[in-house]
Amino acid sequence: LTCFNCPEVYCNRFHTCRNGEKICFKRFNERKLLGKRYTRGCAATCPVAKPREIVECCSTDRCNH
């Protein structure tokens, strides 16, 4: 599995996940409309969203754009 791993809106940097990491995720704060920063990467399970945070998970290559 390969997942994107950069904070910009338009991300083109990705890496190969380690064994056991079968999910790509993208998380961001729903309140920051301008200057939105993302956290992207690989995970074994989908991370839990904090208050006012959105977490999207998927399981195909480079799906966390």
From Swiss-Prot:
Signal peptide: none annotated. InterPro entries: Snake_3FTx (IPR003571), Snake_toxin-like_sf (IPR045860), Snake_toxin_con_site (IPR018354), Toxin_cobra-type (IPR054131). PROSITE patterns: SNAKE_TOXIN (PS00272). Keywords: Disulfide bond, Secreted, Toxin. Pfam families: Toxin_cobra-type. One of its GO terms (cellular component) is extracellular region. Expressed by the venom gland. Disulfide bonds join C3-C24, C6-C11, C17-C42, C46-C57, C58-C63. Coiled coil: none annotated. It is found in: Secreted. GO terms for molecular function: toxin activity. Belongs to the three-finger toxin family. Ancestral subfamily. Orphan group II sub-subfamily. Binds with low affinity to muscular (alpha-1-beta-1-delta-epsilon/CHRNA1-CHRNB1-CHRND-CHRNE) and very low affinity to neuronal (alpha-7/CHRNA7) nicotinic acetylcholine receptor (nAChR). This is Weak toxin CM-13b. It comes from Naja annulifera. The lineage of its organism: Eukaryota, Metazoa, Chordata, Craniata, Vertebrata.
